[in-house]
Amino acid sequence: MIQKLRIAIQKSGRLYDDSISLLKECGIDLRNVKDRLKTESDNFPLEVFFLRDDDIPQYVEDGVADIGIVGKNVLYEKCKEAEIIEELGFGKCRLALAINKNEEYVANYLQGKRIATSYPALLQKYLDENKITAEIHEISGSVEIAPGIGLAEVICDLVSSGSTLFMNGLKEVETILESQAVLVRNKSLDKEHLELVNKLLFRIRSVKKAKRNKYILLNAPNDQLSKIFELLPGMKSPTVLPLAEEGWSSVHSVLSEDEFWEKIEQLKAAGAQGILVVPIEKMIV
C-alpha cells in the first residue's frame, strides 16, 4: 500500500488561499477543495485536511496529520510539540500591544492595566518575562473595540498594516511576536513519511527561492563584460553568448529581488543595454 502524507491546512481565513496556492505552485493537483473537510492529490501522495487553525497544532502533535501549515502565533499560543521545519513567507503579521493613541506610553505603563487579547498564553509569557502584573481579559474576536467599550485599557492583537488600530483610535507600542505561516511536522514520523516530507520540502524551497530571484538578460559591449560580471554573480557565473553584431554579447544571469533595482542601475551605468527581466517559476539548486 502506498503511504500518503497527511497535511492539515486552514479551512478558511487568511492562510487558506496562500496554502492552496503554494501546493499548486509545487505541482500538486488537488481534487475539488470547495466546501470539503478532506481531499487528495492525483499526482503526489498527499491527503489534505481542512481544519480550524487553532486545531492544526494538536492534530499534528497527535499524529492525526503528519504535517501542517499554521501561523507561528497559533502554534506558540497552543504550546504544542510540533516541529517547525520551514518558514513559508506568507501570512506575515505581528502580535502587538496597542493603547489609546492619545496616551503617552512610558515605563511600567502596563503595570496594573486591563489587557484584552485572544492570545492569553503568549501575553502572560511576555508579562512574566518583563515582571509585569496585569489583568488579562480573554476575548475571541474584535479585540480592537475593547478600549472603546471600557473593557480594557490595552489590547494585545495581531497587526498587519496597522489600519485597524488607526480606525479604532489606537497606536502600537510593543511587539510580542513576529509571525508568519510555517510548515510543522509531527516529531515521530517514520522513515517513509520523512522521505515524503523531504520531497515536498524540496519543492517548497524551490518555489520560494524562485520568488526571491529574477532571471535577467542583457546586451553589453565585450570590453565592458568584466565590469558586468562583477555585478552579476548568478548561481555560479553568468551565461555569455556572442551576438551577431561583432563586439557585443548577450549575458544571462539571476538577480536577487532584494538588490534588484540597485543592480539594474549599476548595470546600465556599466554599459548594459536591452535589459529584459523574467520571473522564475521554479529554481532548483
Model-predicted regions and their roles:
Residues 2-45, 70-94, 101-285:
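Small-molecule-sensing regulatory modules
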Residues 40-58:
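Active-site-flanking structural segment that lines cofactor/substrate pockets
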Residues 54-59, 64-80:
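Pocket-flanking alpha-helical
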